[in-house]
Amino acid sequence: MLTRRTFASLAGLAAGSVLLGVLPGCAGPDAGQTAPAANEGEGLNSGEGGKDEMPPTSESAPAAPSAALSPGLLCVAEYANNTLAVVDPSTGEILQRIAAGQNPATVLVADGWVYVGSSGGGEVTAVNIADPSQVTSITVGKQPLGLCYDEAQGVLYVGDYFASSIHLVDTQLKSLVKTVKLNAQGYHNRTDPPDCCRIDPGTGRRTVALALAPEGGLLYCANYGTFDVARVDLATGEEIEAFDGVVGPRQILVSADGAQLLLAGVGGEGEQQVSDLYVLDRSSGKRVQEVPVGQSVAGVAQASDGSAVWAIARDDGELVAFDANWNETGRLPLGVGIDTLVLAPDGETLLVGNSIGGQVHVVDAPSLALLNTIEGLASPKGIAVIA
């Protein structure tokens, strides 16, 4: 079984050298690290998929944006290239690359724009879908990771890893309009991750992924630092009682029926290893189910009608499918290191990213048939699909 350290070693072999340095609707991390010390990068590996698992940053300049972004195209954050790659999933061709700030890690498509969390530069880059030459940089704090769009309010919520805050961006103004600070202490007064994942004590909640309640008004924030789920009342801008979470959270979703939260986490070492997808009651926060997936659950997706769920086991390298009753219906080996999972708007196509191998796999969701593998991406992190 791969540990954090052996996984990082494999990454170094695959990449040739290592750069310290990782999701849909409400996008979660693949989170990036600004510039931590070497031991900090190792510690965050277990919690966020290995920010020290990156190949060297490419020195190649992005091509000038050209044609409008057509429905069905993929937008992929290339962490090591500081670009947003636009990809045709059917041919695997990289059509263009757009400068997207330092260490882009998360991507979200909303309201005619592609939003990219530039985790190394404290900004969100907005790219106009109709005219990709229109690019706006929005300053949002220290390290934006989780992205979530509130269509009713016209607001983009941005989780700030190092500031333990949620920033609110007006998507019409393309400007920061408010910041909500999370409480210093989390669930049961936690202030730190477990020993497996701790670098510096008391470093804050460290939000990595967001999900919006379907009725609006409540934002769920999966936190690495206190391995819990903060709940923010958006009407008051105050945090209410937190839920217990998962060690090394990577993604949080509200279930299709609105009754549950689906929480994916990669865990740590020893007793902190995580091989199950956690299902929480959305009202009480009680963990009602632990669904076996495989070592280090790095992502989750659900069909819009709740009829199917998919999850990925990063260290086992498998995509796993379940029915509505959590019966396993299939597994597809894709290779160790898969760390991003997105269901396309068509509900029929899954995109699975491997930031170490520089790949995005295109998979038929109903059958788990591998349709295509896109190569040549520079540490692909967040993935979004133009609707």
Task: Indicate residue ranges for each PLM-predicted region.
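Predominantly soluble domains enriched in secretory-pathway, periplasmic, or organellar proteins
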Residues: 2-19, 26-387
